[in-house]
Swiss-Prot record:
GO biological process, one term: exocytosis
Record-listed N-acetylthreonine modification sites: 2
Protein's name in the database: Ras-related protein Rab-27B
Tissue spec: Expressed primarily in testis.
Regulation: Regulated by guanine nucleotide exchange factors (GEFs) which promote the exchange of bound GDP for free GTP, GTPase activating proteins (GAPs) which increase the GTP hydrolysis activity, and GDP dissociation inhibitors which inhibit the dissociation of the nucleotide from the GTPase. Activated by GEFs such as DENND10.
Record-level Gene Ontology MF annotations: G protein activity; GDP binding; GTP binding; GTPase activity; myosin V binding; protein domain specific binding
Gene: RAB27B
Annotated signal sequence range: none
Enzymatic reactions: GTP + H2O = GDP + phosphate + H(+)
Organism: Homo sapiens
Annotated family: Belongs to the small GTPase superfamily. Rab family.
Amino acid sequence: MTDGDYDYLIKLLALGDSGVGKTTFLYRYTDNKFNPKFITTVGIDFREKRVVYNAQGPNGSSGKAFKVHLQLWDTAGQERFRSLTTAFFRDAMGFLLMFDLTSQQSFLNVRNWMSQLQANAYCENPDIVLIGNKADLPDQREVNERQARELADKYGIPYFETSAATGQNVEKAVETLLDLIMKRMEQCVEKTQIPDTVNGGNSGNLDGEKPPEKKCIC
């Protein structure tokens, strides 16, 4: 795809404590590489990737294929950058909420991140995927899968255990979030309201019509 040659611009925000592996996770997703030497993110950064999303048609049949430009925002986890991070919440369509499977404290802090997210996101119930990263370090694990799944079930969101080092479930987690977003947009189109930051390319909503400009009712 050339610049501007896409149907949708979707912004995703990676959230979580400093050191949980947000930067390496996003780098694995966009470049399919692992770099353990990334330094701590200062403020906010982003990576980009073009993908094709195949919408589901009636009765589970294949629908139209949409070209999607993903912007994946990488946020600093330190407290001193929290006000800067929350300023980006309202522009994001979906959230990758991450913790470190080798850090119980990063898991406990998921609740704090959820509170901030719910208070600052574009709607009360945004699309979120919970991610337990560093699944490649089982000997150092401090958070068991049952704990994490119970928390995800409490919030009604999908949960994945991932590894930026091996690539385990990295694509699957992002693809699941994108699918949630696109399905929400389809529902919002039916109400003639979608977030005005979404459409960035040549076509309009999921039916190829001109997109409305209001934010989605969630």
